[in-house]
């Protein structure tokens, strides 16, 4: 196998065959409210 990709293979690749997937955030950041609540509970 060669290191370089086969350009003919790339050119004939059909993007329409790719399935559209919904990206799901695995680890969403907490909201500002959540952060404030956690700060208040850790301070007391």
Swiss-Prot record:
Q: Where in the cell is it found?
A: Cytoplasm, Cytoskeleton
The protein depicted here goes by the name: Thymosin beta-4
This molecule's function is given as: Plays an important role in the organization of the cytoskeleton. Binds to and sequesters actin monomers (G actin) and therefore inhibits actin polymerization.
Q: Which coarse location class describes where this protein primarily resides?
A: cytoplasm
- Membership in a protein family: Belongs to the thymosin beta family.
At the top level, the lineage of the source is Eukaryota
Q: Which UniProt keywords apply?
A: Acetylation, Actin-binding, Cytoplasm, Cytoskeleton
Residues bearing N-acetylserine? 2
The entry's note on the tissues where this protein occurs is: Spleen, kidney, heart, and oocytes.
Q: Which PROSITE patterns match?
A: THYMOSIN_B4
Q: Which GO terms describe its molecular function?
A: actin monomer binding
Gene Ontology cellular-component terms listed: cytoplasm; cytoskeleton
> Region Disordered: which residues?
1-44
Composition-biased stretches, type Basic and acidic residues, lie in: 1-25, 33-44
The alphabetized list of GO BP terms reads: actin filament organization; regulation of cell migration
